[in-house]
């Protein structure tokens, strides 16, 4: 129903007095309707029933008077039809309004939901990033705990689990990585897992790991990676070791893994030759130097210095606890001079050893910049792959009997025998040479050529038993040593750890037998603790011995026990042999003088 129909219904039966209100009627044009078109056309155009049939006839006044009922019916049907149309319009309008409102509400709801979803995504991303970080930390902690890696410091670099990570994270030279894998190093050892990333981040390092755990490779790989390529700047890396044998071993390992990279790695053999080769007038076509402290100090003290260390970026001290020792057997003064000679602002230092020395640790904390401390397993502990045994022999003569008993029972060579002095090494050699076994001795009084030949023969298996002093126990890797005999009791637990560390290397099994007498009682407790920590049996009565004070320990290290002679030859024969030796040397010296005079 439209507006006109509504007013028509309301005004049904009401009449407007046109006579009385003629002016208003004329103004609003109230009167009879005038149609511009014929009513028949309208009626013919109407189709109430949807059958497209026109209504015949014309609806006039006469017809309405004649058939009022039909007209009323048509009018009612027309009004009903209009009502239905108006209802449909209302429904469509309300449906459109409802749909618009619904669309608006849906749009509003969707925007709200989108905002809620964004917040949820942000929360989830925060949660996932936090979870990922926690998972990463858990993996790192699991790896460190699994391999007994103990780290102290700030901003600790993550350890590596494989050598391939060096390519993924640090872009290692492909040739260097291939050399490492070709050398048989498929997986990094615990010390390599943590020490390599620390040095690659340029952090100064104090590292301690059991003997035979791959410390040489732990500092060699990051040095070669950080130097990147050869450069004519002089030595950029310096590696110090206490013995020439150990320096030679490090030099050999560096050459092996750097093959094809072009690095020039040198070792000082003769100081005079080195002064010409590495002096101020040299071309500086060298990169890495491996040496002992004394030879380097000799070059530094020359005027002008026979070597320039101003370009050194990495200073590595292997067996640092030995080099930091004071006194005749230590190298503390020499090491201080070397540190001062490395004047570059880029220089970083790394200390490696099988044992943690308190002096070294304190010095590193005071002098190294933001140092990181890395240790594998329990500090100052023996290798777990070594079967350790304490054997009471009563007296000095009992030691020689025990060695001969081992020879009779049979042993699996190669064997290392440690004594406390050069004189005792000579005496034991003369006693065992008649036992029918291939035995040799190595000590500081032998020439360098003799020492090199002895080490080479021992590695080749030509020598079954090698007698040596404690200094040789530092770092040298004799592959396949099955037995270590501590003929003379070590002066400290640290020395004991280094001695027995010559066997059981790289995960292989080994055995260590330590002789002790009544005189060794004060030193027993500290060594017994090391043996017990490694899971080996120790007699109960030894555990009850009193501990030595630190002052007493230092005295015993500086002044070892005076022991009886090993030699079983009567003194009279020994004195005659000495006199004969003096006469021979005197005659030889006279002949030399005579030859010089003639010339």
Curated annotation (Swiss-Prot):
Name the UniProt record assigns to this protein: Probable ATP-dependent RNA helicase DDX52
Compositional bias of kind Basic and acidic residues: 70-83
Organism: Homo sapiens (Human)
Catalytic reaction list: ATP + H2O = ADP + phosphate + H(+)
Gene Ontology molecular functions: ATP binding; ATP hydrolysis activity; RNA binding; RNA helicase activity
GO cellular component: membrane; nucleolus; nucleoplasm
Purpose of the protein: Required for efficient ribosome biogenesis. May control cell cycle progression by regulating translation of mRNAs that contain a terminal oligo pyrimidine (TOP) motif in their 5' UTRs, such as GTPBP4.
EC number: 3.6.4.13
Region annotated Disordered, chain positions: 59-100, 577-599
Keyword RNA-binding: yes
Keywords of this entry: Acetylation, ATP-binding, Helicase, Hydrolase, Nucleotide-binding, Nucleus, Phosphoprotein, RNA-binding
Residues with PTM Phosphoserine: 39
GO BP terms in the entry: maturation of SSU-rRNA
EC primary class: hydrolase
Source domain of life: Eukaryota
Annotated ranges, domain Helicase ATP-binding: 196-374
Renumbered ranges of motif Q motif: 165-193
